[in-house]
């Protein structure tokens, strides 16, 4: 499969993305000797994982992304029992960060990610690594935008990076304990 989205200098359109074909995973793992397998079940890189046209809207008008393809994950898990599965592009794009960015001069309309309950479900299955880099970037950006909005005369990175580091720590702690099921597994 191929993930849609943008990461570094690589861009894959939604039209060019595809889901993992479970019938191909055993041969792929055997031929490559990989020690984990990143599969495509509907995740996407970046903070704009889905276009508004790919989503529905709830009663409040908030975008609701399409569900992940757990049928693909379950079939891959049956074919590769116990094999470590990875999900790239799995940031939840917390709306609190998006709202804070927008409130402090940012422009991130319709940024949406993977719902935490779906990530929690994936972590309970055979997924052992869930990549959430965009959530880290959003935590940092929201904190720094808020800081400079409240302290426009400051310029010392030690001042604005301190709350940014704390925002990342808090978000990662929440994800590890409440979403990814990593608490006590170090």
For each feature predicted by the language model, list its residue ranges.
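Short, ordered loop/turn segments at secondary-structure junctions
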Residues: 1, 42, 89-91, 135-137
